[in-house]
């Protein structure tokens, strides 16, 4: 149903936001980004029509 689709979309967006925050924190602490987190983030962004750089998703 539509509710389930929206729920999955929100969960995916929250997971992406969490990974972005982790990458930022690690970059501030160590001066570089975590390879594992950036790879996982790339997989999540590629898995659907979610485009974090368009509109107010940024």
UniProtKB/Swiss-Prot annotation:
Q: Which GO terms describe its cellular component?
A: host cell membrane; membrane
In the record's own words, the domains note is:
The N-terminus and transmembrane domains are required for self-oligomerization and proper virion budding, whereas the cytoplasmic domain is required for CD4 degradation. The cytoplasmic domain is composed of 2 amphipathic alpha helix that form a U-shape.
Regulation of activity:
Ion channel activity is inhibited by hexamethylene amiloride in vitro.
* Protein name listed in UniProt: Protein Vpu
Query: In which compartments does the protein localize?
Result: Host membrane
How is the polypeptide modified once translated?
A: Phosphorylated by host CK2. This phosphorylation is necessary for interaction with human BRCP and degradation of CD4.
GO terms for biological process, alphabetical: receptor catabolic process; viral release from host cell
Q: How does it sit in the membrane?
A: Single-pass type I membrane protein
- State any further remark: HIV-1 lineages are divided in three main groups, M (for Major), O (for Outlier), and N (for New, or Non-M, Non-O). The vast majority of strains found worldwide belong to the group M. Group O seems to be endemic to and largely confined to Cameroon and neighboring countries in West Central Africa, where these viruses represent a small minority of HIV-1 strains. The group N is represented by a limited number of isolates from Cameroonian persons. The group M is further subdivided in 9 clades or subtypes (A to D, F to H, J and K).
Q: What is the lineage of its organism?
A: Viruses, Riboviria, Pararnavirae, Artverviricota, Revtraviricetes
What does the subunit section of this Swiss-Prot or TrEMBL entry state? Homopentamer. Interacts with host CD4 and BRTC; these interactions induce proteasomal degradation of CD4. Interacts with host BST2; this interaction leads to the degradation of host BST2. Interacts with host FBXW11. Interacts with host AP1M1; this interaction plays a role in the mistrafficking and subsequent degradation of host BST2. Interacts with host RANBP2; this interaction allows Vpu to down-regulate host BLM sumoylation.
Q: What does this protein do?
A: Enhances virion budding, by targeting human CD4 and Tetherin/BST2 to proteasome degradation. Degradation of CD4 prevents any unwanted premature interactions between viral Env and its receptor human CD4 in the endoplasmic reticulum. Degradation of antiretroviral protein Tetherin/BST2 is important for virion budding, as BST2 tethers new viral particles to the host cell membrane. Mechanistically, Vpu bridges either CD4 or BST2 to BTRC, a substrate recognition subunit of the Skp1/Cullin/F-box protein E3 ubiquitin ligase, induces their ubiquitination and subsequent proteasomal degradation.
Which organism encodes this protein? Human immunodeficiency virus type 1 group M subtype A (isolate Z321)
């Amino acid at each position: 149903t539509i509710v389930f689709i929206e729920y999955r979309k929100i969960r995916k967006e929250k997971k992406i936001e969490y990974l972005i925050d982790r990458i930022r924190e690690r970059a501030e602490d160590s001066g570089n980004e975590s390879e594992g987190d950036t790879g996982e983030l790339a997989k999540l962004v590629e898995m659907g029509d979610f485009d974090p750089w368009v509109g107010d998703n940024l």
